[in-house]
Amino acid sequence: MLELKWDGKDVALKTAEKIPLRLLDFDSSLSHGEKNSGNIIIQGDNLKAMKSLLPFYRGQVKCIYIDPPYNTGAAFEHYNDNFPHSDWLSMMYPRLEMLREFLSDDGAIFISIDDTEQAYLKIICDEIFGRDNFVANFFWRKRTAKSDVPHGISQDCEYILCYAKSESFHGSIKGKERKYFLTEDFPNRAWRYHDLTKQTTAAERPNSFFTIVNPKNGEEFPAQVNRTWAITMETFKSYYEQDRIIFPGDYDFLKISKPVLRYWKDDDIKKSGENFGMVAASTFLPADVGMSQNGTKEITEIFGEKKFSFPKPSSLIQHLIGIAVTTDKNSIVLDAFAGSGTTAHAVLNLNNVDGGSRKFILIEEQPYCNTITAERVRKIGGDFNFYRLGEKISDSEGKINPKVTFEQLAGFIWFSLTKSPYIQTEHSPLIGIHNGTAIYLLYNEILTRNILAMLPKHDGAKIIFGSACRIDDDFLKENKISFRQIPKELSL
C-alpha cells in the first residue's frame, strides 16, 4: 500500500496513545437549556479532549464532520492556518486516528479541505481508515469565479473527503417524493409508473426485441432496434396478469405513448425498508447547499456582525451529515474543529425538519469557544452542556493525581456512565443512582467488607470505584457488585 513519509511521522504515530486522560470540568454558567440534552461543547485542545471523551463514546458516533486548517499560508483572525507541511501532517494524523475510534461500524467521516493538502490528506486517510473504506470526494462550489487570481485560474471549489468505518456504512439522502396515484380500479393501493424500455440494442437483448400487443384493442407497440423493452415476452405476460402493465388510454390523466410498468407503493416500502424515499447522494453537491457568502450572511444575521472568517453555511453541513444520519434520528454527530458552531446549527436544523433527536459534540480550543461557538448555539435555541479540559487524572506513577478532588473525579465517573453532568448535593461515596444501579466512589480507599458495610445502602446493582479490592469474586457476584479500579479502569 502507498505510504506517505515525512519528517516527524514516527512521533505522530505515537502521539495519540501518549495523551493522558483528563477530567472534563462542567461549567453550568456557560451551559444552556436542558442539562440532559446529550449535546456537549468542550473548550480545549481537540486531541486531549477526544482522548477524554473516547472512553464514553468509542464506536458510538454515526457521523463526524471536521473543517481543519487548510494550511493555505493565510493568517486568519481566529485560527492558525500556516503550518509547515510536515507539521500539518503530524497535527492531522493522530487526530484522524482518534476520530476513527469514535465511529460506529456504520458511521462515516466528512473532512473539508482544499487543493493545498487534499492529495496528502487522501493518502493518510487511506492509511488510517483503509483504502477500501474511501466513499467519495465531494465537490463544493464555494464562490463564483474571481478575476484577480494566480495564473488566471480561479479556484472556486473545495473538497469534502468521505470515509466509512466499514462496509456497513450506507449513505443516502431524502429524494423528491415520488408521485403515487390512487385510482378507481385500485382505490386502496397506491401506485406509480416507470418506463418499460431499456437503452440496449436488439443485438444485445434479442429476447427483449419483440412487439407488445394490447390484449384489449390489439394495438401494437414494437421495440426499437436501439432501445429494446426492459423485459422479455414471458415477463410481459406475467406482469400483465398482475395488473402491472399500463397502456396508452388506460387512464385519461396519463399522457403516455407506449406501455409503462406499474409499481405498487407497498412493494416499494417493503423493498426499501427504512430507506424508503431515499436516493443516492451525488458527489456534485447541489446549489442549494450554499456558498461561503451564505455562511458569512448566516453568522452576520445571528450576531449582527461578521464574527468569523469563512464559516461554512449550515445548509452544506446539514446536507453532508444528512447523507449519514437521515435514517437514524437518534445518532451522534461529532465535530472536533468546531469553529463557529456550524455543525451544531446543522444538527438542530435537521432535527427540526424531521423531528429527530440527534445529538452533537463540539470541540474547540480557541477562546471564542464560548463567545462564538457556544453563543451561536444559545442564540438559535440549542441546549448543551459546556465543559473545559481539567487536570490529568493520573500522575506519572499511575496513581490518582493529588490535584484531582473527590468531586471532580466523581463528576468524571458520573459523566462516563450517564453522559450527563454531576450535580453535587452532598459529599458521599454514593455519587448517584442511574437506571437502578448505585454508583460509588471510594477515591483512594480499598474496598473491603468493612468498608462495604459502611457505604450507603442500595438493594440493586452496584458499581464501586476504588484503588483496590480485597473482596473475593464470588461475594461480589452474589451481592451484584462490579468493582472498577481507578485510575486504570476509568479509560476502559
Predicted segments, located by residue:
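Conserved proline-anchored active-site loop of SAM-dependent methyltransferases
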Residues: G59-A74, C125, V333-V347
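Basic, amphipathic juxtamembrane/active-site segments
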Residues: A74-W88, A346-Q366
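Conserved SAM-binding loop and adjacent beta-strand
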Residues: G304-S315
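Mobile active-site "lid"/loop adjacent to the S-adenosyl-L-methionine
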Residues: K62, P69-M91, S104-D106
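Conserved beta-strand signature within the Rossmann-like core of class I S-adenosyl-L-methionine
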Residues: G107-I111
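Short acidic, Gly/Ser-rich segments with clustered Asp/Glu that frequently serve as metal-coordination loops
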Residues: N46-A49, N71
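Accessory, often C-terminal, charged low-complexity segments
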Residues: M1-R22, F26-G33, S37-N39, L47, ...
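Generic enzyme active-site microenvironment
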Residues: Q43, Y65, P69, S112, ...
